[in-house]
C-alpha cells in the first residue's frame, strides 16, 4: 500500500514539474505543504485507534468496532470541515502569513482547490485504515489507491497544461 500511496501523493508535483514552470511547482508546493500539515491533524486519531479497532474485530466485538469507527468519522468531520472552510475562505491571508509576504500569492487558488481533500483524505483514512484493514480488506484499500493514482494521472495530463498549479490541485 505505501508504494501506491507514495506514487499517488508525488504524481502531481512530478507532472507539474515536467509540464510547466518552476514557479507553478512552487505555488502548488506551498499549497500542498499547508494541506500536509492539516491532513496529519485530521488523520491522527485513525492511526491511534487502529490497534483498538483490530482488537475489536479479532474479539468479534462488532458493537464496539462500530462505535469506535463512528467516533473516528465524527472526529474527522469535526476537525476537517472547519479547517477546510477556514483555509478556503482565508487562503490568501494564510499564504501571506505563512510565506511572509506576497511572493506566493498565486498559491491562493491552488490552496482553495486542494482544501476539500482534507475531508476526503480524512474519511478515506477512517474507512481504509480503521475499518477495512482490521477487517482484512487490505486488497480493497490497495485497489482504491491504484484507482486514485490512475484518475490523478489522467486528470493531471488533461488539466495541468492549461491550468498549471490549479489543474494539479483538482
Residues of each region from the PLM?
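Short alpha-helical transmembrane segments in multi-pass integral membrane proteins
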Residues: 32, 68, 72-88, 103, ...
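Interfacial segments at transmembrane-helix termini and the short loops linking adjacent helices
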Residues: 22-24, 70, 87-123
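Hydrophobic side-chain positions within alpha-helical transmembrane segments
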Residues: 15, 49, 53, 90, ...
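Helix-loop junctions and terminal segments of transmembrane helices
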Residues: 31, 35-74, 80, 128-134
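Short runs within selected transmembrane alpha-helices of multi-pass transporters and secretion channels
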Residues: 1, 5, 9, 32, ...
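Helix-terminus/linker motif at the lipid-water interface of multi-pass membrane proteins
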Residues: 6-37, 55-56, 92-103, 162
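A cross-family signal for key residues in well-ordered alpha-helices
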Residues: 17-18, 66, 79, 96, ...
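Juxtamembrane/transmembrane-helix boundary motifs in multi-pass membrane proteins
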Residues: 23, 34, 62-71, 75, ...
Amino acid at each position: 500500500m505505501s508504494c501506491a500511496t507514495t506514487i499517488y501523493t508525488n504524481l502531481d508535483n512530478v507532472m507539474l514539474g515536467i509540464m510547466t514552470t518552476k514557479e507553478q511547482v512552487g505555488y502548488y508546493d506551498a499549497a500542498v505543504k499547508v494541506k500536509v500539515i492539516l491532513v496529519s491533524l485530521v488523520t491522527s486519531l485513525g492511526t491511534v485507534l487502529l490497534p483498538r479497532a483490530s482488537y475489536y474485530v479479532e474479539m468479534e466485538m462488532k458493537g464496539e468496532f462500530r462505535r469506535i469507527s463512528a467516533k473516528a468519522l465524527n472526529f474527522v468531520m469535526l476537525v476537517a470541515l472547519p479547517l477546510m472552510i477556514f483555509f478556503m475562505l482565508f487562503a490568501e491571508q494564510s499564504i501571506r502569513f505563512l510565506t511572509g509576504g506576497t511572493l506566493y500569492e498565486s498559491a491562493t487558488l491552488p490552496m482553495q482547490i486542494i482544501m476539500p481533500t482534507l475531508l476526503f483524505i480524512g474519511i478515506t483514512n477512517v474507512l481504509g485504515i480503521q475499518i477495512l484493514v482490521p477487517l482484512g480488506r487490505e486488497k480493497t484499500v490497495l485497489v482504491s489507491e491504484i484507482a486514485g493514482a490512475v484518475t490523478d494521472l489522467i486528470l493531471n495530463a488533461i488539466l495541468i497544461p492549461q491550468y498549471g498549479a490549479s489543474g494539479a490541485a483538482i
